[in-house]
């Protein structure tokens, strides 16, 4: 099975798998059952921003979700990613819909990682930034239903030609280049990721959510990982 660390924007509470009984953001370490959650005042039809950061000195993974003109939501969890993830990984975004649905539109996405060792010369870093997504992106690996539209947006799940979200959809987008996320001799391994998103839904209860995730380089959508499993995990264990 894939090794996954994720930050989830979970729009639909699945209390049977340990979700709190409201939309929330959460940090997932190798399981859909979040290690830490915070209530998320989701605003459909408004562009939101997510900022995720990790620093191997503090060993803290944190995420902040905000909408213009309203207060932000923060979640954090103390974890040493050296003990969880392989040395080389890929970073991605995933989303699902189920019986209920929503658009899972990504408007921009940036990522920076730095790996500092004792040697001044030896710094591994990776940076990418998408402010628009091209129609046939060479620098993204699109999985499942994910596609880029003519407006320069990344749609992680299916939408109709008129822009309406479709149910029972799962899609992911990964940056093509692997990331050197840690190394035994590294003094500091850190990363920052930011993306902007737009969730719209005709349903009273939108579903299911969007994630930023880090996984082994050969990661693929697990069978049966739709809906509440957010395209990341084969089961709810």
From Swiss-Prot:
Subunit structure: Homotetramer.
Binding site for a carbohydrate: 12, 99-100, 228
Note: Binds one manganese (or another transition metal) ion and one calcium ion. The metal ions are essential for the saccharide-binding and cell-agglutinating activities.
Function statement: D-mannose/D-glucose-binding lectin. Has anti-inflammatory activity in rats. Induces histamine release in mast cells from rat. Induces lymphocyte proliferation and IFNG production. Shows toxicity against the aquatic snail B.glabrata at concentrations higher than 50 ug/ml.
Binding site residues for Mn(2+): 8, 10, 19, 24, 34
GO molecular function: carbohydrate binding; D-mannose binding; identical protein binding; metal ion binding; toxin activity
Binding sites annotated in the UniProt record for Ca(2+): 10, 12, 14, 19, 208
PTM comment, free text: The beta and gamma chains are produced by partial proteolytic processing of the lectin alpha chain by an asparaginyl endopeptidase. Mixture of 60% alpha lectin and 40% of its beta and gamma proteolytic fragments.
Coiled-coil residues: none
UniProt cross-references to Pfam families, sorted A to Z: Lectin_legB
The species this protein was found in: Dioclea grandiflora
Family membership noted in the UniProt record: Belongs to the leguminous lectin family.
Full protein name: Lectin alpha chain
Key words, A-Z: Calcium, Lectin, Manganese, Mannose-binding, Metal-binding, Toxin
Gene3D superfamilies: 2.60.120.200
